């Protein structure tokens, strides 16, 4: 074996021994040919520490690992002790959050505020009153001086004459799509949740649709909404003139008195619809069209009460409502025209597929009462004129053909109520059998 091969073998053997004594690789620098002062002050202290720890044997390391494995909670306990120590040193944390919202309203400085929740009286927070604002609204929420709300108001049976609003309606007026952000942004408003009895009462009175029966409905008082928004919730409202806290707004000078309040309509097209077509006092849905069929009105009988917005008023918020309202109107028009043609004009209904004129069977003659020859000044006119007289007690009542059914079929089979109904129908058909 040559000297070079022997030297290489000795280096490999030395490396194996080094790895067997320690899991760490040997990063020692060969300083044999380097001129380094042993008393150098800039010598790396980390290198000395690593070199001193190089002699740790595997048994000590394995014992330490075994001890950690036996107590898997050492690290967690150590972290908990550090947290307790930090708390003892004065590190404070807020572990509970206040469940009460902190209303913000004019008239109270930050120095006077505290974390105590405000009192709720008559379903609204007790906020400071403005003498000038009290001349614009009553305690029940009725506006004074000819002012009108942009949204409808109604009362609850057990709340007397106090006026309320659906929270979603003023929310849309001021630019919110729902009431969640409405209450989060305006904590001065108290959220009053209806119970099932109150919802049923409003549904029976026509204020709420039946689909709201199983939903959570939030109300706000009309007085509270006026205090919060002032002229923005008033039809044609003007700054300071129609605001509740007029004195403070006049002092701040942020708005010009008498100028029209900012128009929030562009933020919500549904608000535009509410302003142009406000809900009726009894809460009837304007999409439902009550048609009286036997009035001789023109074809465009709904032009005066058109509730369908034009294309420029459609948006991502109200398109579904506008589509539903248009379908409701179209169905009403079809039904009105069909009944008018059949029963009023007596012209029949032409089928678009077969081009056949259909006439109700109840309007056709069943017998000839007589014929006569009329005197005609024109001898060449040999036409025949049919004069048909229709006599029917009720055109809307169908003819079922019960008058032709013998009594033996249903006697002793049906009860008295059904028998009475059959007899009435038979008598009706017999009276109108011959024209």
Swiss-Prot record:
<dbReference type="GO" id="GO:0006337">
    <property type="term" value="P:nucleosome disassembly"/>
</dbReference>
<feature type="modified residue" description="Phosphoserine">
    <location>
        <position position="86"/>
    </location>
</feature>
<dbReference type="GO" id="GO:0031490">
    <property type="term" value="F:chromatin DNA binding"/>
</dbReference>
<dbReference type="InterPro" id="IPR013933">
    <property type="entry name" value="CRC_Rsc7/Swp82"/>
</dbReference>
<dbReference type="GO" id="GO:0006338">
    <property type="term" value="P:chromatin remodeling"/>
</dbReference>
<keyword id="KW-0539">Nucleus</keyword>
<feature type="compositionally biased region" description="Acidic residues">
    <location>
        <begin position="30"/>
        <end position="66"/>
    </location>
</feature>
<keyword id="KW-0597">Phosphoprotein</keyword>
<dbReference type="Pfam" id="PF08624">
    <property type="entry name" value="CRC_subunit"/>
</dbReference>
<keyword id="KW-0804">Transcription</keyword>
<keyword id="KW-0156">Chromatin regulator</keyword>
<dbReference type="GO" id="GO:0016586">
    <property type="term" value="C:RSC-type complex"/>
</dbReference>
<feature type="region of interest" description="Disordered">
    <location>
        <begin position="1"/>
        <end position="97"/>
    </location>
</feature>
<dbReference type="GO" id="GO:0005634">
    <property type="term" value="C:nucleus"/>
</dbReference>
<dbReference type="GO" id="GO:0000785">
    <property type="term" value="C:chromatin"/>
</dbReference>
<dbReference type="GO" id="GO:0006368">
    <property type="term" value="P:transcription elongation by RNA polymerase II"/>
</dbReference>
<keyword id="KW-0805">Transcription regulation</keyword>
<comment type="function">
    <text>Component of the chromatin structure remodeling complex (RSC), which is involved in transcription regulation and nucleosome positioning. RSC is responsible for the transfer of a histone octamer from a nucleosome core particle to naked DNA. The reaction requires ATP and involves an activated RSC-nucleosome intermediate. Remodeling reaction also involves DNA translocation, DNA twist and conformational change.</text>
</comment>
<comment type="similarity">
    <text>Belongs to the RSC7/SWP82 family. RSC7 subfamily.</text>
</comment>
<feature type="region of interest" description="Functional region; able to complement all NPL6 null allele phenotypes">
    <location>
        <begin position="248"/>
        <end position="435"/>
    </location>
</feature>
<comment type="subunit">
    <text>Interacts with ARP7, ARP9, RSC3, RSC8, RSC30 and STH1. Component of the two forms of the RSC complex composed of at least either RSC1 or RSC2, and ARP7, ARP9, LDB7, NPL6, RSC3, RSC30, RSC4, RSC58, RSC6, RSC8, RSC9, SFH1, STH1, HTL1 and probably RTT102. The complexes interact with histone and histone variant components of centromeric chromatin. Component of a fungal-specific module (HTL1-LDB7-NPL6-RSC3-RSC30) within the RSC complex.</text>
</comment>
<protein>
    <recommendedName>
        <fullName>Chromatin structure-remodeling complex subunit RSC7</fullName>
    </recommendedName>
</protein>
């Amino acid at each position: 074996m040559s000297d070079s091969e022997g030297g290489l073998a000795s280096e490999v053997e030395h490396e194996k021994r080094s790895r067997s004594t320690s899991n760490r690789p040997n990063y020692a620098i060969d300083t044999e040919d380097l001129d380094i002062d042993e008393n150098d002050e800039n010598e790396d202290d980390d290198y000395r520490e690593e070199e001193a720890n190089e002699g740790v044997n595997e048994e000590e390391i394995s014992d330490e690992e075994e001890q950690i494995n036996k107590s898997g909670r050492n690290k967690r306990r150590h972290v908990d002790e550090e947290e307790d120590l930090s708390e003892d040193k004065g590190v404070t944390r807020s572990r509970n959050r206040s469940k009460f919202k902190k209303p913000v309203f004019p008239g109270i400085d930050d120095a006077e505020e505290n974390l105590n929740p405000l009192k709720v009286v008559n379903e609204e927070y007790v906020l400071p009153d403005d003498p000038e604002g009290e001349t614009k609204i009553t305690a029940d929420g009725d506006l004074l001086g000819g002012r009108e709300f942009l949204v409808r108001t109604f009362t609850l049976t057990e709340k007397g004459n106090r006026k309320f609003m659906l929270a979603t309606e003023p929310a849309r007026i001021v630019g919110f799509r729902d009431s969640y952000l409405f209450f989060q942004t305006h904590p001065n408003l108290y959220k009053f949740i209806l119970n099932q009895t109150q919802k049923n009462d409003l549904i029976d009175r026509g204020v709420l649709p039946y689909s709201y029966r199983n939903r959570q409905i939030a109300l706000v008082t009309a007085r509270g909404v006026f205090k919060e928004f002032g002229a923005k919730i008033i039809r044609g409202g003007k700054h300071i003139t129609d605001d509740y806290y007029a004195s403070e707004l006049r002092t701040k000078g942020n708005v010009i008195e008498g100028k029209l309040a900012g128009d929030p309509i562009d933020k919500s097209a549904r608000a535009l619809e509410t302003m142009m077509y406000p809900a009726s006092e009894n809460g009837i849905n304007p999409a439902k069209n009550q048609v009286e069929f036997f009035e001789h009105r023109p074809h465009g009988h709904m032009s005066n009460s058109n509730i369908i917005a034009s294309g420029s008023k459609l948006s991502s918020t109200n398109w579904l409502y506008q589509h539903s309202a248009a379908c409701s109107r179209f169905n009403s028009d079809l039904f009105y025209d069909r009944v008018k043609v059949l029963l009023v004009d007596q012209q029949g209904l032409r089928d678009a597929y077969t081009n056949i004129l259909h006439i109700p069977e109840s309007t056709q003659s069943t017998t000839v009462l007589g014929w006569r020859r009329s005197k005609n000044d024109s001898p060449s006119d040999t036409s025949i004129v049919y004069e048909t007289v229709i006599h029917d007690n009720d055109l809307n009542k169908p003819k079922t053909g019960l008058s032709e059914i013998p009594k033996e079929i249903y006697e002793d089979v049906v009860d008295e109520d059904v028998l009475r109904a059959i007899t009435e129908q038979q008598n009706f058909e017999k009276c109108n059998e011959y024209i």
